[in-house]
């Protein structure tokens, strides 16, 4: 990076910008002085976001409620970058132009769109029978997201003031784009049971999810959870201990979660058509080629994180002082990682597989 001495001024006496001088062969002020003096470079960033949610609830019958909601999000991001040839003067009466780097005569435009939709419907039912309290919840979930990018640039602008690709007539032009889409479909439930006003507690829940990120036959996974609790302090035998200890609760739980965070199409072997060879043929343009991606794993599926936990809760001084102790064991199966090492002669990287296991434990 080259900067200027304090004796250099950004503008010559004749009003032209300073970029190079007879005393320096390096760009003065890194060329920014000339660019700012001309004032024709322009950048614009625009972001738009629209989101809405509709929700409805129904009381179907006593203790039975059904709810449904729909969410929609559209995100749009646009950029425009215009750079032009920048005039400057090295000697009096002689105008030169900066035509490389930041002085390339070019217009770039990009546009990114995200569309997201989610639909949920679920119901819950409560039932009290003597000392038994039961609550059941079950539902359905669907969500999808689509992403699309467009990028265009072209040189040879006919105007230094107008921003329109129709006014770019140069041969140097690039265009690129891309789009991705995924969908997630799932059903879920939760059952809560309480006996004797919360003396004995039980809960079970689970999800059955399917993801478009995996090949058909490997898209769905079931992830259950369950927990039990015993409030020892509510037992009759606890008796006089209540004077000093307000709450004693023993907990035991097991839970599993699914992880689908892989690429949108990792299970598909793709073809890249944007390659350019370093060879010039008769039309004086570099030849294009298509290349096949690295091999993929056909049985890539969900990563599953399972956790066992045991805990103890204590409450003192009318529950103003609370102590909690926990110990857990976590087992992560099917972690996505590079698969079996392939011979160097194969000429490609190893495909991702559910080939890694992580085991952790702790107590606090």
Range-by-range predicted roles:
Residues 10-36, 87-100:
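A subset of solvent-exposed loop/turn segments in beta-rich extracellular surface proteins, enriched
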Residues 8-10, 219:
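Alpha-helix N-cap/helix-initiation sites
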